[in-house]
Amino acid sequence: MGLLAGYFGGKTDALISYLITTRLAMPVVMVALASASLIGGSLKVVIILLGCLLWDRFAVVVRAAVQQIRDAEYVASAQALGCSTLRILASEILPNLVGALIVVATLEMAHAILLESALSFLGVGVQPPIPSWGLMIAEGKPYMFFSPWVIAIPGVALMVLVLGINLVGDGLRDLILPDGRN
């Protein structure tokens, strides 16, 4: 969606930007919590919810990157050669977005892990046969005062994983997109 909005501009950009802004206005945790409690919690439901709720940041980044790239000389030369719009998008613009998409994907991965853990902690995420750190923390609540390691170990593991993914994302951003360096 961001690819189309950034390339075509005009009414297409306005419509897609409106959809993105509408989606960004909804609180992710509340929508996921309401949807998961209505549909029921399972691994398949959580994966579909994460996909439906976390696409917007990809679209925003792609739209902004395409708006910068669409006026480049190599895109204009492809248009002058008579290449179709689909070919220009697929062979000229999309390969130049891979770096930005990798960075957003690593940072959104941490967001998805935290959202899944929150849903599982609240009881509407994945169900007990499937391991989840949120579920482990929820099941350890009764033992919090007598055996604090039951919730501390999955909590610390979750924190280390999310921190590690964020650090990798920051490192990739500095490596792939040098424009944003301080």
Positions of predicted regions on the chain:
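Glycine-rich helix-loop "coupling/hinge" segments at transmembrane-helix boundaries
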Residues: L24, S35-I39, L50, A65-V66, ...
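Amphipathic cytosolic juxtamembrane alpha-helices at the membrane-cytosol interface
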Residues: G9-S17, Q67-D71, A76-V103
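A short glycine-centered flexible hinge/capping loop motif at secondary-structure junctions
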Residues: G2, G6-G10, L81-C83, P129, ...
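A residue-level signal for alpha-helical anchor/packing sites in multi-pass solute transporters
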Residues: L3-L4, A34, I47, G51, ...
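Generic hydrophobic transmembrane alpha-helix motif, especially the helices
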Residues: M1-A59, A64-Q68, I102
